[in-house]
Amino acid sequence: MAIEMLGLILAGGQGTRLGKLTKDVAKPAVPFGGRYRIIDFALSNCANSNVKNVGVITQYQPLTLNAHIGNGAPWGLNGINSGVTILQPYSSQEGSKWFEGTSHAVYQNISYIDQQNPEYVLILSGDHIYKMDYEAMLESHKEREASLTVSVMEVPLEEASRFGIMNTDDNDRIIEFEEKPKEPKSNLASMGIYIFNWKRLREVLVNGYSKGNPIEDFGGDVIPAYIEAGENVFAYRFKGYWKDVGTIDSLHQSSMEFLDLNNELNITDKSWRIYSHNDISAPQFITEKLKVKNALVGDGCYVDGTVIHSILSQNIHVQEGTTIEDSFIMSGTFIGENVTIKNAIIGENAKIGDNVEIIGEDEVAVIGHGEIKGENKNEQ
């Protein structure tokens, strides 16, 4: 049975710039916002945009990510006419090969895409924080009779050299793509979100690989090839909150912005919920000694200290005399007595002993998943 649009989430990134936080976890599986993982935003956008069939292409350290996604039930992707499929590298008669780029990952999964038989494919990155209506983007794609639509957003011109930049005509037709140009001509940055007519993209990928001219990356290879061939390539302008959380600084910044309930993410918006897979935990327990200001505290937490402008995920134990400020603490962490944590990210299941100071001064301080720092005489 044919479907109108298939979602493909590229979730195999190693995320080396996140250091300790991606040592054993794929970047899209890194926790965010107290109860989410980064990939929840792309999956929730699909669910809210009526994209009911989604393939998640994984590669690096997929176990946590696979367990989190499961059968897709938290996002409503487990119905008769919907589904989420985990797509990992595999062996065939031609041998086995790791994905060598974004478009190569799609090429390696042509058989899955053909089984879904979509008219359009929606290509997404699994490591961005944003809320977006993909149906509106598809309508723009169809109205313009585009072969490829690239979602873009305006960035300050002085920062444009950090992005892939789309140069357009007066009708937003893309006439040139520049990857991180030293002297950008435009401030329209690619968001790594694409809608392709599947029949044409399939043809381009197959022709390239069959003729020994591999097309490995959407930004570096596919978009320039489409423009050079005179295809209808258009920019779709997105206005809203969007953050690439691929560095420690950007992850920390976005986490702190998440504490502002008036930000453009608006997690309280019932019309566009962000869904996630969460284990059932006991209610949080707040002692009479707790001092809290502008913070998110998850289920299962025991807090007996001071929490200021911070996020505490689920099942965190904070003992007496401890102060946490401007920090993101991931789930399962134990923090002892008289600890000071400021401008930091603490990974899942870490153990912080008594009287320890973790203070990010010139840069954000990071404690990895399961890392132990100091000793605690009363660990529970």
From Swiss-Prot:
Annotated alpha-D-glucose 1-phosphate binding sites: 164, 179-180, 190
Catalytic EC class = transferase
Gene3D superfamilies with a match to the protein in the record: Hexapeptide repeat proteins, Spore Coat Polysaccharide Biosynthesis Protein SpsA, Chain A
EC number(s)?
Answer: 2.7.7.27
Give the quaternary structure: Homotetramer.
Organism from which the protein derives: Lactococcus lactis subsp. cremoris (strain SK11)
Pathway field of the UniProt record reads: Glycan biosynthesis; glycogen biosynthesis
**Entry-linked SUPFAM superfamilies:** Nucleotide-diphospho-sugar transferases (SSF53448), Trimeric LpxA-like enzymes (SSF51161)
What InterPro entries has UniProt attached to this entry?
A: ADP-Glc_PPase, ADP_Glu_pyroP_CS, GlgC_bac, GlmU/GlgC-like_hexapep, NTP_transferase_dom, Nucleotide-diphossugar_trans, Trimer_LpxA-like_sf
Q: Provide the function of this protein.
A: Involved in the biosynthesis of ADP-glucose, a building block required for the elongation reactions to produce glycogen. Catalyzes the reaction between ATP and alpha-D-glucose 1-phosphate (G1P) to produce pyrophosphate and ADP-Glc.
Q: Which family does it belong to?
A: Belongs to the bacterial/plant glucose-1-phosphate adenylyltransferase family.
Which keywords annotate this record? ATP-binding, Carbohydrate metabolism, Glycogen biosynthesis, Glycogen metabolism, Nucleotide-binding, Nucleotidyltransferase, Transferase
Biological process GO terms, please? glycogen biosynthetic process
Q: Name one GO molecular function term.
A: glucose-1-phosphate adenylyltransferase activity
The protein here is known as: Glucose-1-phosphate adenylyltransferase
Reaction catalyzed: alpha-D-glucose 1-phosphate + ATP + H(+) = ADP-alpha-D-glucose + diphosphate
